[in-house]
Amino acid sequence: TQGVSSAASDVYKRQLQDFTAAVERLVAGIERKGSVLRSDERQVVAYHEMGHALAASSLPAMDPVHKVSIIPRAAGSLGYTLQRPTDDRYLISTQMLRDRLVVLMAGRAAEHLAFGQVSTGAADDLGRATDIARQLVTRFGMSPVLGQAVLERQQAGYLGDSLLRLSLIHI
């Protein structure tokens, strides 16, 4: 019976490892086995990812950090920080969106603090943060300056263009 229990436990562990690997492939892409980063690049990527992980861990509204990797992936990322939701979420508050912005920008901030400069490795994070910031203002009406206005749906024209330009300046 102890052997059966041990075998069942091994099967469960293997299934969990396979599931985790599948999630990582979906989120970050397939590992680039032949890609080896230079030591200095690996250090920058490590600081960058730890910036994300530390920020996510320090913000109570953020999902917990499950794994941090600095293994290059086929999708173009040199590393990633994987957060796992603890429950289903259907609504996202202003604070949660702002916290996501903090986590996205924390990798770049960590690079700047550690090395006095930033790298191109933060380009995807910067793009995603810009998208969230734009949606906060133009889609969700969460701007303290422009108020509760959904600018994304307005028809083109003089007023719509002016408000959109104003919202982009605000972002």
Question: Which role does the model predict for each range below?
Answer:
Residues 1-8, 12, 169-170:
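Single conserved hydrophobic/aromatic residue that forms the stacking wall/gate
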Residues 23, 170-171:
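Adenylate-forming
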Residues 1, 36-39, 90, 122:
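Alpha-helix N-cap/helix-initiation motif
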Residues 43-47, 53-168:
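Soluble catalytic regions of large protease machineries
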Residues 10-19, 25-44, 140-148:
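C-terminal helical "lid" subdomain and adjoining coupling/linker elements of P-loop NTPases
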